UniProtKB/Swiss-Prot annotation:
Family: Belongs to the UPF0735 family.
Pfam families in UniProt: ACT
Domain of life of the organism encoding this protein: Bacteria
HAMAP family: UPF0735
Protein name as annotated: UPF0735 ACT domain-containing protein GTNG_2535
Domain (ACT): residue spans on this chain: 69-144
NCBIfam families: PRK04435.1 (NF003361)
Amino acid sequence: MEKKFYLVREDILPEAMKKVVLAKQLLERKKAASVAEAAQLANISRGVFYKYRDAIFPFQAVTKENIVTLFFHLEDRSGTLSQLLSVVAAAGCNVLTIHQTIPLQGRANVTLSVSTNDMHEDIDELLAKLRGLEFVEKVEIVGSGVY
């Protein structure tokens, strides 16, 4: 039987599933030496861990071998695209395409397609850094796919 997949917001996930993701991260980052320790630190039973471990994955884990397309709404200032690309490059992303609109009324839209193969941080961390840039008014993921 073919399995179906859904992209679901974190705030509607059951607490047990969120804790399984936490336990998996603890194991991946070597903060826990065993499943038993990770389950204990995440405050779940080993049974819950084993029940859901192969069924839930953070979005960034699914995008490890993908192209991610990001949309930005930026203030039109000198050097903004350069700073934006520096943050993306520092995360280990390889920029594949750039599309920038002509600035109108002091604003410009930029769409970046990046390869996340060599990315060394979570996509959420990268998005937080990008949102922290003072000239970024909006950033969102508009697509992702395997190439």
